[in-house]
Amino acid sequence: GSEMCIRDRIDAVCERYNYEFIRTPIFEASELYHRGVGETSDIVTKETYDFTDRGERKMTLRPEGTAGVVRSYIENKMYGDAKQPIKLYYNGTMYRYERPQSGRDRELTQFGVEVLGSDDPMIDAEVISIAVNIYKMVGLKGIKVNINSLGDKESRDNYRKILIEYFTPYINEMCDDCKNRLEKNPLRILDCKVDGDSDIMKKAPKITDYLNDASRERFERVQKYLDLLDIDYVVNPSIVRGLDYYDHTVFEVEAMVEGFGSQNVLGAGGRYNGLVKELDGPSVPGMGFAMGLGRLMLAIEKENIELPIDDSIDCFVMYVSDTEKDYATTLVQELRMNGYKVDTEYTGRGLKAQFKQADRLNSKFLIILNDEDLKNNE
């Protein structure tokens, strides 16, 4: 149905950009997510499904795709491949233990791309353009791209101190999560779901004002390539993303649809130049993004987009007698082997009911078998 139609379009966009499909396991060692995604991210502190297997190993159902792809990249020594960078895309189910609400499910189908082995700002722009083109391919009109830069480690460390200084006087007015974040990871306070709209947040220092020269120049180059690719975007300094591994470019694509509620971010991503090394691989830069299929379907529904789904079949083969049924069995198989989408009768209905069934299946052609003709080999 419509989900398959969307998946096919997503795959087509990725293949056009020369990305290869990768499949990773549904569960991994828990340590992968605690190290890769970060101890302070919501996903790890509150949202993972963890279990201990029979060998007493701590395992986690994957809450996101990047860490598993990077683990596979390291284990399979893809960094040694001559054709760099390695450009991959994936889709599959992710699991998050959170309160189910519109646009947020505990089991979700997620799709994403990862590029490993290039620090070129052009790759940042390419990944953002893939996201935008996917949404355009399914017909979404109302989308907005928000971009930001978290800079390099030096810029972030500097900004971190500024944030701690700024937020400390307001500690009693913060939600419990933000109180914990203040020392551990103050950037995450800007991502707060509770106090996000408060004046304290709106007046907080902006990271774009604290980027060092190298980080600022890099961010300007990303914007230059987005302009060359004719992609509309807004620089939004409050975009920090919920995972701890990002640096430099981060972005979100939101749905500008009436009645979409608070879960209006369709997809998001960014650059993670330190993640491969953090997971015991070589120092290899990376960039990626992910999107939930459920939210995309919701946006398509809200925009009243009709996907062109072909639910017809090429031919329906009808019969009544046992002799006709035997012939139908071989005929249906032969047609299928020649590339046709074919069905036949399986419940012993009469011809009148079979006509109705063919109609329900939107069959383009009918073949009605007749004992007399079969005897005469007609």
Where are these regions (language model features)?
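TRNA-recognition modules of translation machinery and tRNA-sensing kinases, especially anticodon-binding
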Residues: 2-378
